[in-house]
Amino acid sequence: TPGKLVTLRDVGHTFTGDTWLFRLLNADLRPDRVYALVGPSGSGKSTLLSILAGWVKPSEGSIQRLNIGKTSWVFQNPIGVARRSVIDHVMLPYLARGLDVPQAEACARELLAQFGLAERASSEYRELSGGEAQRLMLARGVASGADLLLVDEPTAQLDVHTADTVNARLGALSRQGMIVVVATHDHRTRDAATDVIDLEDYQ
């Protein structure tokens, strides 16, 4: 979608005042791209996601969001409601956006199919594997209608085939008008991204 933009200018962050996670980070984040955020553990990937989400103010520099309505964050360790059905997890964001129940259910079923969860629609969340729960939370983030999708280690619990499916879905979401930023250690996710931000370049 034209007009959506997240701009980082000379962004840096420190928790101690003397040791910086990263400094002088400049980037223009746009739809139709998947940005892989890479670097060793402790390099600040999750902190930068928090800055992008607006939860943390950078120690220096500025961040601007243009035409960014909703931000959705998919955490590394998915959190769902144990006894709630899979389809309800995805229907609820659609209902919150004003769809009626039949519309919300139809959209939810389509989305679950895209993430390989169609046969799990009536299962309870607690019955899912780690990989299934991760895909469900991605689907839920999509259902929320987010302009900015932040994803933390989406393939950490997935086998190679499922990870490739998730990486392909992230690419498809970016082409539908989302800005997608993925913190990852997975070289396959990095390779599937259109752009790489390596925090080691900003030490």
Language model feature labels by segment:
Residues V38-P40:
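The feature captures the beta-strand-to-loop junction immediately N-terminal to the Walker
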Residues A53:
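Helix-to-loop junction immediately C-terminal to a conserved catalytic motif
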Residues R84-L95:
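Q-loop/switch helix immediately C-terminal to the Walker
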Residues P102-R120:
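Conserved ABC ATPase "signature" region
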Residues E124-L128, E132:
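Conserved ABC ATPase signature
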Residues G141-V142:
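ABC ATPase C-loop
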Residues V160-T162:
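Helix N-cap at the start of a conserved alpha-helix in ABC-type nucleotide-binding domains
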